[in-house]
Structure formats: structure tokens, C-alpha cells
Amino acid sequence: MSDKDSINRRNVLRKIGGIGVASAVGFSGLASGESLSDDEKQDVIDTIYKSQRVEQIKKKFGGVNIEPKKVQSVTTNQSGDLVTAKLSVSDGDLVYSSVKDTTVIVQFDRSASEIGESWPKNTEAFIKSTSSGVDLLRTATDEEIKDVTEGVNTSEIESADAVNIFIDPESQTYYMEKYDFNNKVLEMFELATGGTSSGKISPTREDQNHEYNVREHKVFNSEKQNIQLQSDCNINSNTAADVILCFNQVGSCALCSPTLVGGPVPTVACLLVVCFGTPNAVSAILEEVDNSCFNLIKDVISCWDEWTSFW
């Protein structure tokens, strides 16, 4: 990031510097949008909207209104460069992360059908823009969830503490994620339909690989990462949401500790968003963070080297 893109105003650094957030990877602090001046907020907006990821969204989905309305939260590194941000936009929320590879996610606050797609009712749509391109994804219906989970080894689903499914309707790719709290294991399956004439999933328990064409299977065991967490404030359920949101592909094994985020449900929501950019889980996390908890993480990412090499 060039100097002109740095969020390096003294007031920003004074307000959020020295907090000690994830110093192993250079994070210097986090601030709520309310604590920034108008000029500082504009600096954040300018940096995000000059990014290639936002341009990709505008080019492919010109009808989506991502005009910025409010800066909700910001993190910077020690040089003042923008690391993560969450903004309210006209059509929902926009999440920006430049930790490893810059990622922009737009989570709509309305149903998918309202943006011109003939998708089932009660599904939610979101855009994910990365170096690999731009995808418009949606959450699964109850019937699709049933079909997918029945097509996967029954014991795997029954043993999971939580399962999440979302879909790329254009490529008919289904993604399933499940988390085992006891063994601290997160698994992600990238699946495809079995080539049925209707395009509808028709899984069988006997031959899930044939029906699903499992393209990729990732397993992440957080217990093996030797994570150490410390907190200086009392954390109520879900209050660490904006601290962990958007730390895409970095240290999620530590940031998503059940102790940190207040229990199994918000922990899974955290893991799905943070690790794999799955913002349909955001609804499980409160929008606001108690300012007193901005100082809650001291030593976070001892797993940094193993995490980056794993992915």
C-alpha cells in the first residue's frame, strides 16, 4: 500500500494505537466509526473505494448500490495503513480486509429476489470479491440443507456442533462447513451437483463423492496451533464481533475462541465469516461492540506461520 493510501492521520493513530491487537502480524489497533472525525472517515472510504475489489463489484454488478453511509469499525497497522473496515452501505454492509489478500464482501440487508435474481424466497445474497474474481452467492433453503446433509456421511453431520451451507447458483457449487467444538476442528467441503437433469441436488449416502463431486476438503485443527489468549475486560455474549469480523484468513483459530466470543453459536458465526468469508453468519453476531472491549486481545497469533502455510 502506498503512502497516499495510508490512514495515517495523527488522531486516528492516537485513538487506536497501542492497543496491541495481533501485533504478530502488525495490527496496531481498532476503533469504532463513532470515534473518528469526518476527515478520518473519508480517508477510510477513499482507500476502500479506490481498491480493485470494489471496482470489480461495480463492473460486474452495476445495479448494486454500495454507496457508503456509515463507517462502523476500522483497524490499522503500525504504519497507519487500513487493514480491515466495516461500512454500512445503501444495500447492506460492506466488509473490507487487506490482511493477506484483499477481500471485499457486500452483505445485503434484503432478500436475494429483490436484486433481480429468481432465487428461492427467504434466502440471503452476498457478493464476495477477491483476487480470484467476483461471486454472487446465496444461503441455502431448508430443503437444500436437508438434501445436502442427508447426502453426507450421517455420522459426520450428527457429530457436528454446527453446519452451514451456502451456494454459488451460477456454477451450482455448494459449500458446506461444519464445526466440532470438542475436537476444535473446522471442516469445509466444496461440492458440486451430481449432474442431474433438473440441476437439483440428488445425493445418496452410499456414494457422496459421485453425487457431490467433492472438489476440495479442508480441515483446520485449532488445538494444534498452541493458541494463547488473554483478555482485560469482561466479555458478554457476542460483544467481540467487530474485533474478529474481517480478519480474513488470519489467526481465526485464536480470534474465534468460544471463550472470546461468548459460546458455540457466535464462535461458529465468527469462524465462518473470518476464515472463509461467509457473511450469512453475520446475523448471529451483534452489530455493536462495547468500546471498553477494544483492549481485549493481547497475544493472539502464535499460529501465524502454520496458518498461512496451511492455506
Curated annotation (Swiss-Prot):
Keyword Secreted assigned: yes
Protein's cellular compartments: Secreted
Primary localization: secreted
Residues that make up the propeptide removed upon maturation: 1-230, 267-311
Entry GO CC: extracellular region
Keyword hit for Electron transport: no
GO BP of this protein: defense response to bacterium; killing of cells of another organism
PROSITE patterns xrefs: TAT
Keywords attached to this entry: Antibiotic, Antimicrobial, Bacteriocin, Plasmid, Secreted
InterPro entries assigned to the protein according to its UniProt record, in alphabetical order: TAT_signal
Taxonomic superkingdom: Archaea
Primary role: Has antibacterial activity against the haloarchaeons H.salinarium NRC817, Halobacterium GRB and H.gibbonsii.
Leftover remarks: Halocin-S8 is quite robust, as it can be desalted, boiled, subjected to organic solvents, and stored at 4 degrees Celsius for extended periods without losing activity.
Stated name of the protein: Halocin-S8
Lineage: Archaea, Methanobacteriati, Methanobacteriota, Stenosarchaea group, Halobacteria
Gene encoding the protein: halS8
